[in-house]
Amino acid sequence: MQEQYRPEEIESKVQLHWEEKRTFEVTEDESKEKYYCLSMLPYPSGRLHMGHVRNYTIGDVIARYQRMLGKNVLQPIGWDAFGLPAEGAAVKNNTAPAPWTYDNINYMKNQLKMLGFGYDWSRELATCTPEYYRWEQQFFTELYKKGLVYKKTSAVNWCPNDQTVLANEQVIDGCCWRCDTKVERKEIPQWFIKITAYADELLNDLDKLDHWPDTVKTMQRNWIGRSEGVEITFDVQNSDEKLTVYTTRPDTFMGVTYLAVAAGHPLAQAAAAANPALGDFIAECRNTKVAEADMATMEKKGVDTGLKAIHPLTGEAIPVWAANFVLMEYGTGAVMAVPGHDQRDYEFATKYSLPIKPVILTAEGTAPDLSEQALTEKGVLFNSGEFDGLDFEAAFNAIADKLAAKGVGERKVNYRLRDWGVSRQRYWGAPIPMVTLEDGTVMPTPADQLPVILPEDVVMDGITSPIKADPEWAKTTVNGQPALRETDTFDTFMESSWYYARYTCPQYKEGMLDEKAANYWLPVDIYIGGIEHAIMHLLYFRFFHKLMRDAGMVNSDEPAKQLLCQGMVLADAFYYVGANGERNWVSPKDAIVERDEKGRIVKASDAAGHELVYTGMSKMSKSKNNGIDPQEMVERYGADTVRLFMMFASPADMTLEWQESGVEGANRFLKRVWRLVYEHTSLGDAPALNVDALNDDQKALRRDVHKTIAKVSDDIGRRQTFNTAIAAIMELMNKLAKAPQEGEQDRALMREALLAVVRMLNPFTPHVSFTLWQELKGEGDIDNAPWPQADDSAMVEDTTLVVVQVNGKVRGKITVAADATEEQVRERAAQEHLVAKYLAGVTVRKVIYVPGKLLNLVVG
């Protein structure tokens, strides 16, 4: 065995062994308990970042541990390979998205291998290949036939100069990111999947997810947003038209002072013909971003349409305003406004001098002061005619019943959740498999024409999708008729909604899933990824699973039993202010820092002499130039060190602060483990361990070894507190480093201890563990070795610590044999100097003894 720990030599050797032996390839085996460990698949951006490394290290630790428990462990990997960044990069690098993507996949694949992750590479998939997306296309056509897919017009961000649709992130300050033209809202036809048909099940089944974080479940509950309310119809004065609104607060109905409709509402559009101000306002609303978050923060504006609606219970004529905060695609495109009891309605009414009518009393039973804000709390009604004196629930029912009796109101359950718009007017995505025949009939692409293949050999102009720019691509023939293909592509959330299931049968050619394989592996036992995916991806992931279940492909209701959301990786961030007042961010590795005695940064500069502003730790990002390249760290310290630091520096679900001093500490620890194994093996083969021949010191050390095994097993397996597991191994190593290796049983015990340490470290640091296991002559490869078992008999304490009190006050602590009698404990206590002092010249009147824990002597 070589004396020095040289990770660069051993890691490549061990990785080659895994590749040649196909160590982590698995097949279905009914005789073994399965365990499916999955980390969210990466987007092939070009290089791994530390967030990836943390995510995949956590997954690999869990997978390797479960494998050592004897389970049949599936840990696959693939590439979420479609998406907008590839289009931008292709234009910038004068290439097409496909070669850019495949080059990145190859590069990142080598990076993943360099980190020693135990993936079943035979199952690798890339979502941009027709072999993958053909099944998604076929499934979509089946959903269409079931009535779960439909087309309707929906608002998008439109650049009138480039004549193209922009994603929300391509709209900068209301303008196109490319040509700076003012962006408009435009209604275009798009495809939708009816996720709302599953809203109740998606909501109710959250209760089955006992091992998902509560934060994620709460976010999904709020996103689905189930509410119970009343849909109310208003007649429009001097017209046959009607306006329908939905409210969850019918108790405030007598306080309605105006209605607000979307700029795109048919009534507003019609009224604009005779109202130029309204026409201008509708045109202005076309320049509003379509993201809901933007709607919430923008200035609320409106114009009176001149129309009046009739309050169904009071007969009062109420003004109808067009407002930019009402969206046509949300609900009915109209809302009732109660400015006395809704803050948004209040601000709008105040701005435009609309009436404000209070109808709910304060908690003290007085009329509310509405001079500064609305009273939004529920309470008892007043100013509401026959409904005065009713509380929220009674008023809700009474008003709902009265409206229903008049035929103008209906109780309804509503959802905040909207159907999933899956159309994207982009190139780099899976083509939507729909066609329009010459006679105008819209239908799914016939099965024998699937997949609809995206051409990869294209020229990107950065404006129009190549398949939209090429009229020939869309031309096809269906049922003997000329037809045009859909030129929109799928939202990339489509691919990431079912990849986990395809991993169970990636080579299967008869359909989307091989049901036998899928139902052997599914559901996923643990899914690991960032909490930023809580609503979009994780909701679509659950939805798709239910769609596949209802198509008879999977048996379970939910895709993953446990969800672990890893924390972000933070690093120091520094900048200096440039000549024009701009911030120039400097990489932490280029910062020269001074620290105080507590290690805090007090001053920083760079090589060019700029004085740097230290902003503290923040998420590693390109914008702050504070990312640390994992490859650089692996080349400097080895993959095992990087992995160990990642798992030790912080609990898995908390943020991790990148500190190179911590990485150095992890490296020193692995050198110590190597050194101890080297010293042990250089003494020759150890004899067999004879437990009965151990002296007290040896028994105590063996007790520590087995207590550590028990703790580490619990920390990794049940608690998933990996940092405390590593801390326990480090503590044991400190004891082993001081243990003698002279006697035969000393060496036998050391071998038992080191074999346990190396196996406990194996999930974290697999390369060095593999090598040291061989040096210790462990049986077979460590990859097939069982997890160490704690010996209960070794953990039994020979001695115990008893607290001695005199008249209830602690006067000493004594160590006695675990099986000592009360008499022996009293004798031993009397020998303690301090205890003896308090017993001198007094009589012991009473003795309270809690065996093995406490002796209280009552004296007088």
Curated annotation (Swiss-Prot):
Give residue numbers for sequence motif 'KMSKS' region: 619-623
Q: Which coarse location class applies to the principal site listed for this UniProt protein? A: cytoplasm
Return the GO cellular component terms, semicolon-separated: cytosol
Q: Which keywords annotate this record?
A: Aminoacyl-tRNA synthetase, ATP-binding, Cytoplasm, Ligase, Nucleotide-binding, Protein biosynthesis
List the ranges annotated as motif 'HIGH' region: 42-52
Query: Where on this chain does ATP bind?
Result: 622
Q: Name one GO molecular function term.
A: aminoacyl-tRNA deacylase activity
Q: What is its EC number?
A: 6.1.1.4
Its subcellular locations are: Cytoplasm
**Recorded catalytic activity of this chain's protein:** tRNA(Leu) + L-leucine + ATP = L-leucyl-tRNA(Leu) + AMP + diphosphate
The UniProt entry, under InterPro entries, shows: aa-tRNA-synth_I_CS, aa-tRNA-synth_Ia, Leu-tRNA-ligase, Leu_tRNA-synth_edit, M/V/L/I-tRNA-synth_anticd-bd, Methionyl/Leucyl_tRNA_Synth, Rossmann-like_a/b/a_fold, tRNAsynth_Ia_anticodon-bd
Q: Name one Pfam family in it.
A: tRNA-synt_1
| Source species, domain of life | Bacteria
How would you classify this enzyme at the top EC level?
ligase
Q: Which GO terms describe its biological process?
A: leucyl-tRNA aminoacylation
- What NCBIfam families would the database entry show? leuS_bact (TIGR00396)
| Family, as annotated | Belongs to the class-I aminoacyl-tRNA synthetase family.
This chain's protein is named Leucine--tRNA ligase
